[in-house]
């Protein structure tokens, strides 16, 4: 149903932060398209409704396509004022001085500038977009916003319980197979007693209850678990506040079969009460694969 599709059209002044905005919407799970020709939007909207496969869409439409200016203004006005396509218009703005400064820093030319005069292009663009700015559902002034602060502002306005951007990737692994290169935090649990040396547990993994119980019933395991969980509870909010969209925590033992798997499972349950958590066990099948090859 159309009511179930959330469409955000990102527009505004050139240099005001539309690229950062689009990247932020991508992290919120939106399907994003940059600089779509306005003539294609009605057809695209029909395809979206017919397919039913997309529920969150963000489009950047601005005056870079100068040849389509009349279409752009008419389309944005229809969306903002008349509510066509069940869309919301997000308008990004900044002061003339800040926009000039940003253009000087990047050494790019303004799309509406004549003879390279940036301020002239900004003035013309501001005049042309004035009706859209007035009718937009949300205007964000980025003059004093860093990219991270703009990202936070967009999250504040568009993040919902079902589209939470921040999530935790929790991974077990075996040191003998190498460190996970994408991990933000790596914890070595090879100091814990190893179930591998118990014949009845050797061919099981931390996913099996006997191994899980053996690992968790060790006195040092409980003390370590509580301390490590306390550390994560303290530092994870800081990672989120700094603008990370995901945090990868890797827990390693020798082969990635027993200790790391059991602890990753338990931590996943605990952290999952507060954050979206995805648990993977990178090397849990490695021994089975080796046995099959030999």
Swiss-Prot record:
Keyword field contains Manganese: no
Gene3D superfamilies in alphabetical order: P-loop containing nucleotide triphosphate hydrolases (3.40.50.300)
Keywords: ATP-binding, GTP-binding, Nucleotide-binding
GO molecular function, one term: GTP binding
Entry keyword ATP-binding: yes
Disulfide-bond pairs as recorded: none
Residues involved in ATP binding: 12-19
Residue numbers binding GTP: 62-65
InterPro entries membership: P-loop_NTPase (IPR027417), RapZ-like (IPR005337), RapZ-like_N (IPR053930), RapZ_C (IPR053931)
SUPFAM superfamilies per the UniProt record, alphabetical: P-loop containing nucleoside triphosphate hydrolases
UniProt xrefs under HAMAP family: RapZ_like
Biological role: Displays ATPase and GTPase activities.
Annotated PANTHER family: RNASE ADAPTER PROTEIN RAPZ
Family as reported in the entry's similarity comment: Belongs to the RapZ-like family.
Protein name as catalogued: Nucleotide-binding protein LVIS_0651
């Amino acid at each position: 149903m159309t009511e179930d599709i959330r469409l955000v059209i990102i527009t505004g002044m050139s240099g005001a932060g539309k690229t950062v905005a689009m990247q932020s919407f991508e992290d919120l799970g939106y399907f994003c398209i940059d600089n779509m020709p306005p003539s294609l939007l009605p057809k695209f909207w029909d395809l979206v409704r017919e397919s039913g496969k997309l529920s969150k869409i963000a489009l950047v439409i601005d005056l870079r396509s100068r040849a389509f200016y009349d279409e752009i203004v008419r389309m944005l006005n229809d969306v903002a004022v008349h509510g066509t396509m069940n869309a919301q218009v997000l308008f990004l703005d900044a002061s003339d001085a800040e926009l000039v400064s940003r253009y000087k820093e990047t050494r790019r030319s303004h799309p509406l500038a004549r003879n390279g005069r940036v301020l002239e292009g900004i003035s013309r663009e501001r005049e042309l977009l004035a009706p859209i700015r007035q009718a937009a559902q949300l205007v964000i002034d980025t003059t004093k916003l860093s990219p991270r602060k703009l990202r936070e502002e967009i999250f504040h306005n568009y993040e919902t319980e079902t589209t939470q951007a921040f999530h935790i990737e929790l991974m077990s692994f075996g040191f003998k197979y190498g460190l996970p290169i994408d991990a933000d935090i790596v914890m070595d649990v090879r100091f814990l007693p190893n179930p591998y040396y118990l014949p009845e547990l050797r061919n099981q993994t931390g996913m099996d209850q006997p191994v899980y119980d053996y690992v968790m019933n060790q006195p040092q395991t409980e003390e370590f678990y509580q301390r490590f969980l306390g550390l994560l509870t303290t530092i994870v909010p800081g990672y989120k506040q700094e603008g990370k969209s995901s945090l990868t925590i890797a827990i390693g033992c020798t082969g990635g079969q027993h200790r790391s798997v059991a602890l990753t499972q338990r931590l996943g349950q605990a952290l999952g009460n507060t954050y979206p958590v995805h648990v993977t066990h990178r090397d849990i099948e490695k021994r089975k694969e080796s046995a099959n090859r030999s």
